Each structure stands twice: as C-alpha cells, then as structure tokens.
Amino acid sequence: MNESSESPPPSRTFSSLPYDIILNCLARVSRYHYPTLSLVSKEFQSLIASRELYATRSRIGKTERFLYICLNLTKSNPKYRWFTLPPVPNEQKLLPVPLFTYHLNSSTVSSTDSEIYIIGGLVWGNRSKKASIFDCRSHQTRRLPKMRFPRASAAAHVIDGKIYVIGGGEIRGEVYDPTTQTWLTTPVDHTTEECQKVYDKHGVNICFVEIDNLLCQTFVFNGKLYWRHPRGDDFGWARVKGVEQELFRNHLSYVDKSGGGRRVTVWWKSVVVFGCQGLGYSTEFDTEIWCAEISFERRGLKELWGFVEWSRKVFTCKGCDSPTDFVMDSVLVTY
C-alpha cells in the first residue's frame, strides 16, 4: 500500500490524556485563568473545583498568594464587598469575589491556606462572639462555634493551624482548634509575638514587613508613607525615601502586605468628573480605586528606600459616594 494513502493517526484531545497528566498541566497554570478555563466544559469545571488540583499545586510548588481585600464603596449605605487582586504582571485589577459578602464592622480577618476567618465585630454597636470561615476555592461560607468572649477590632494569628485571638475589648486570649471545633481560653503570653505586635497598633493601620531579617513597621499618615523599627528606641517614625516624587500627588489611605516578600501595597482613590452641564457643574462622577506595589531597600540604620514596582487603577465604580476610609480589611491567601 502506498504510504501517502495511509490515514493519518487520530489526533488526541487534551481530555483524552491520563487524569494525573491533566492535573499536572492545569496545576502549572495561574489561578487567574481558572474562571475562563472552567467555561471550556463541565469536565474542566469539575477539575478546577477539585481538591486534587490544589493538592497537586501544593505538591509541585505552584501555589500562589492572592490578596483579598474588603472595600466599603458606599458611604450613605455601607455595603462591604470583597475583591481579589491576582498577582498577574501588567494585568492587576480587582475581581469581585462571588458569594463573599459577610463582614461585620470592626471584625478581624485571618487566613490559613485557602480559608479566611472572620472573627467578631460590632452588631448594633455591641461586640460580637460570632465567627465564620470562607473557603476561597468553593466560595462557601460556614459558621463557626461562637467565641467565649465578645470582641471587636481584635488581633488574630494562625499558628500550627490554630487561630489565636487577643484584644478587642477582652484581656483574655482564646484559641480555636479546627480539629475539635472548640474555643479554649489561653493566656496572652502564650500567643505569638506577631499577634501581639498587631494588637499594639491600637486601631492605626500599621503593616509589618520583614526587610533583611528585620521586622519593620510601615503606615500611612496624611497621605505619606512612613516606617520605623518597632524596637528602635533611638529614632521614631521616618518617611520612606524615594517614593515622594512617584506618589506625592496621591493621598495614600491604606498600606498592607503584598505577596512579594519585602513589599507592600498602598491604596488611594480619586474622583473623576465628567459631563459638565450648565454653569460647569456636573452630577456625573466616577470613583477610581488605585493601587501601587512598593518594594523596600535598607540603606544604613535610619534610611528605608521605596521603589514603585507598579502603579495603576484597579477598579472603577459609579458616583463619588465612596468614604475616605474605604479599605475595611485585607488578607493574603495561599493555595
């Protein structure tokens, strides 16, 4: 038989590959693309929602850190909305998190793996014992047993899978064990140093970042970025150098960790006016949410330099009713 007349070998589709190979391939793709991939077929949708996929990502070292942030975009009728900021170069933008709306005023958030804990808060002005957990993979929220003490604006930290909580109007600490699903009272001395440092912020938005094995404090004041060594008695707060010319026109309002080690994200908003009518007045506005990621470099004992890695608009909402303190909370999630 003439070779040219032979039928070509049948082509193999992606879904015909062995299951383990499919998981390995998908695990190497950024989670940013998973919503799009889930639209390919029901099989893909099932694979992307499977625990096996995330176990594979963890096993081959392909987990990613996503920043989840809660915004209050309406001052007249406060309604908190959660977003995620994927770590995708040149494509940073806030994506709404579906089915994640629960967030009491003055509650505390902490995370372990793909789960976000929401602890305490204010209900009609009273501190709450409520606690819940949101699974970022399944987008499901479930209630946890109530805490032993009501708290608002407490501090929380995860150690060995257990949630340690202190402060928030109660001098006693407590710890939640997911295995037994119980809260137990614990001395404050038994909580971690990191948790104690967060508790010391007294309501001020202070972010801790490790730079050259030194844990530094950073915070925003009057729209400027400051830093200090929390145990340094010889000098206080100092301006972060190098970012003044980059961001001096923007009134920074919030600072938090990013997924890049010695880096932070800073947040601000601006109002855009358009469609002027009559005497130049306009009732049409857009509120733009901006974000920048800043990396740090120490130069001597008393100088910290900042470098803007990227800066861009990440979200736009209609109107200009967004409150000044529009960032309610944020947390890093790894999976």
Curated annotation (Swiss-Prot):
The UniProt record lists the keyword Repeat: yes
PROSITE patterns linked to this entry: FBOX
Name this polypeptide is given: Putative F-box/kelch-repeat protein At5g02980
Species this chain originates from: Arabidopsis thaliana
Pfam families, alphabetized: F-box, Kelch_FKB95
Segments traversing the membrane: none
Keywords recorded for this protein, A-Z: Kelch repeat, Repeat
Kelch repeat start-end pairs: 115-161, 163-211
Domain F-box: 11-57
InterPro entries reported for this sequence: F-box-like_dom_sf, F-box/kelch-repeat_ARATH, F-box_dom, Kelch-typ_b-propeller, Kelch_1
Coiled-coil parts of chain: none
